[in-house]
């Protein structure tokens, strides 16, 4: 277990969260002012919907707050967590730095995908180097078996051969980074969803007795929460790709470091993941690139239907919180939940997963109903967001 510099777990958790929150709030304000002086702004144009120039480097502030808090609060003690630590921090430094350059200068989508791949390679290197010790660090080499209770495969854990674990880790990590990137379409949306997810992961880690992982999740939650006041509509600063890519990378790692949380992460981010998957399929079927800019995402459609930014963001906050509560209650009161909600963090039956998928589809149906039910006021502009995607936002 991580040695938290002799701090009691509760003290480390609270102090880590508080330190990260304060640092992120201060750094975001400072970086916003620096970006304005240097002219590192997202300028309004016909292809954008915001009306004033806004800095896009908020992700750098989030990362710096996280990094400083992590270095001050804990140190890895076990081999697994040391390998994760050795891979995650360099990968986070790399992806934040290169995407900060993208926020300032701009990079084509192919280059950005290549840089994401480099970040994943950095993430996996310590685990690859220690493979002879049967310890793969950030490489996802096993998953909990959802078919165990159905007696399809009689094992709680499915071991993934390294030849498949490497591409699976790439797909999971790059997919998570781009999911958060695509969700970053309204002020406060990506940051708030990520913060709620991190808080839920903190609670679950505490319930599972994984206090070191809980501290890491709490620091991450505090870093994002400290940024949110600056990003709430109307935003004074955008997180940019430096922020969305770091947030996605961190979520991908946090789901793996504690073990048994990949399914939980998919539950919490089920709506954004389904939304991104559907939009990408529609783009590809329409002969466009997967990362071609359009307004097919749920938050775009809700915006065009007349809902305000705040209403839409709060809808997504509510959905994320709802699924987070289900995940927590499945540990605290598993027998009190309806059958389809009893999703064990240590492994769920196929029926449970199907039930949860149906719940997710029901949420999509509700959002679709809201889109059809309300129509925009003709006297008001339809698009009010100040955080647009770029045409090739990856």
Please annotate each region the language model reported.
Residues 298, 377-394:
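Short, highly charged, low-complexity non-transmembrane loops/tails of multi-pass membrane proteins
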Residues 30-34, 366-382:
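Membrane-interface capping segments at transmembrane-helix boundaries
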